[in-house]
Amino acid sequence: MSAEDILNEIKAAVINKAPGNAVITDVEFEGSEVVIYAKNPELFSNNLIKEFARDFRKRLAIRPDPSVLVEPDIAKDKILKIVPEDAEITNCIFDANTGEVIIESKKPGLVIGKEGSTLEDIKKAIQWAPKPVRTPPIPSDTIKAIRATMYRERADVKDILRRIGRRIHRDVRLRDDSWVRTSFLGGSREVGRTCLYHQTPESRILVDCGINIAVEDEKAFPHFDAPEFSIEEIDAVVVTHAHLDHCGFIPGLFRYGYDGPVYCTKPTRDLMTLLQKDYVDITEKEGKNVPYSSKDIKNCIKHTIPLDYGVTTDIAPAIKLTMHNAGHILGSAIAHCHVGDGLYNVAYTGDIKFEASRLLEPAVCQFPRLETLIIESTYGGYDDVLPERDETEKEFLRVIAETIARKGKAIIPVFGIGRAQELMLVLEEGYNQGIFNAPVYLDGMIWEATAIHTAYPEYLSKNMRNRIFHEGDNPFLSEVFKKVKNTNDRRNIMDSDEPGIILTTSGMLSGGPSVEYFKNLADDEKNSIVFVGYQSEGTLGRKIQKGFKEIPLMGKNGRSKAVKVNLSVHTLEGFSGHSDRKQLIKYLRKLKPIPDRILTVHGEVSKCIDLASTAYKLFKKETKAPMNLDSIRLR
């Protein structure tokens, strides 16, 4: 049966069972949902909606017909009249495709009203479905731009969703003897360019599609030359998190003809857009070939369908996706794919942290069903036991305090997302305790990434949420943090005799402001550089770690200049957003259910093999450390 035939059946059933005065105007597939448009959507009871969802075995959404929605300008005026001024409404964002209006305010409780009474008044007055949220304390240009794109291109976005819906909901029933296989196109026995390719007789799913920013040849990108891979056959792309080694090439897929959905959490959508734009800007400035443009990033945004943790969604014929917290960075997810009607279950961890941090809760380790687990191995080697976080924080603050005491500057190269915010929390506490007294400069994308963090407090740890909401203390707003707004600010910081701490991207000194700071501050022994994250082989960061005393770097005139390395060099591994060996093994021990097969990826050769070997000894299950271009039949 075609998707059109299925939709017609659903339409007939809805019209037959819906209240007569609901006035059904349309029923459509939009992405994974069946969307029912009605002039009086409030007449649909929760029981009737549940009955439809059970009968159709699909996610259901009831939305007001566009004709009954009050014009946004008039609707905003009505909202401001209904809601008490004390709520301090700062913005109203109207989404014509969903019929929702996001109401940002400093006191969302007043927008809700007693037992939701104010929300009901708003809905009756404007017909839009109100969604109150707390105003982010730091405005985000990225979120603003994404919302503007989605509003400006709303007609195109609706067409995209309907086209995707028809592809998802075509009638497909996998036989009991159907096969499931995964091809490893990148990130196997290496770190960088992560890309998995799940295949069934009816569907093709790409999970992550990253870039290895440490290399410049074809090894920077996944193996799109694999014989089984065809960009025209991809049904969906899933993104586990926003680091470039997992999401860096996704806009490139659109450049070369992909026209399907991208599934990720909302924070991942926003953060990956930020990183992709930054990657394009830096690559262009360095005169290198850029694999895609800002137009391709915009196209990616329009095709992105955000998912919440724990929500199961149809993403392709006979494949359902559920995303679970991975504990790595904001919005990071474990991608659990359910194939067929109980036929097979495979989960890919992405990058995981199985330990609570200041910022995030630990990774989820319990699933309804699981036959194959694909797990990262960044620190999977026998000797990869990282120091305890408390001890690492003390050592970090000691290095900072000593550097400031000798009137030096501490350069801390970091990924703009995740580790930067963790370190901000440590530095804020150290400053409050009087361990050091100097400004912390935030350069590169760190300020904007932090703004995005403040927009999604529900993804932060319970302790952070309590501190922000109940104690009224947002550490990201501390007076110690100073935004570096432009190159003049950067030059003034480098030329100043005053001590300071510089949090800057990129984390491996593969580009961005961190390289400029290093060039200008490396020869002064009063200064220090503190590595808090993994440094890939071949990067400037790895060379500094190895103790190079002189490093040739390109100057502004295009000529190579030898930079003397006199500053003190420190490496602190305990801040990693990855699980170390102990945490990885603990994760496998806690995993429920224990899968039949464990595959190790995302690590240097020895680390992937070591973790696979240990997993076999512990669980006596099939284990393997696949190589790039391997294909494994899972079922």
Curated annotation (Swiss-Prot):
Q: Which organism is it from?
A: Methanococcus maripaludis (strain DSM 14266 / JCM 13030 / NBRC 101832 / S2 / LL)
| Residues reported in the UniProt entry to bind Zn(2+) 1 | 241, 243, 328, 351
**Role, per record:** Terminates transcription on the whole genome. Termination is linked to FttA-mediated RNA cleavage and does not require NTP hydrolysis. Cleaves endonucleolytically at the RNA exit channel of RNA polymerase (RNAP); the 5'-3' exonuclease activity of this protein degrades the nascent RNA released from RNAP. Terminates transcription genome-wide. Transcription termination is most effective in vivo on RNAs with more than one U4-tract in their 3'-ends (including non-protein coding RNAs); U4-tracts are recognized by this protein. Also plays a role in termination of RNAs without U-tracts by an unknown mechanism. Has endonuclease activity after U-rich tracts in transcription termination sites. Binds RNA at U4-tracts found directly upstream of the experimentally determined transcription termination sites; binds preferentially to RNAs with more U4-tracts at their 3'-ends.
Q: How does it assemble?
A: Homodimer. Interacts with RNA polymerase (RNAP); interaction is not dependent on DNA or RNA. Interacts with the Spt4-Spt5 complex.
Query: Has the keyword Membrane been applied to this entry?
Result: no
Q: What is this protein called?
A: Transcription termination factor FttA
Could you tell me which InterPro entries the record lists for this protein?
aCPSF1 (IPR019975), Beta_Casp (IPR022712), KH_dom (IPR004087), KH_dom-like_a/b (IPR015946), KH_dom_type_2 (IPR004044), MBL (IPR050698), Metallo-B-lactamas (IPR001279), RibonucZ/Hydroxyglut_hydro (IPR036866)
Q: Which gene encodes it?
A: fttA
Question: What's in the misc comment field?
Answer: Present at 0.125 pmol per ug total cell proteins in mid-exponential phase and at 0.14 pmol per ug total cell proteins in stationary phase at 37 degrees Celsius; RpoL (subunit of RNAP) is estimated at 0.072 pmol and 0.086 pmol per ug total cell proteins in med-exponential and stationary phases respectively.
Cofactor(s) recorded in Swiss-Prot or TrEMBL: Zn(2+)
Lineage of the species this protein comes from: Archaea, Methanobacteriati, Methanobacteriota, Methanomada group, Methanococci
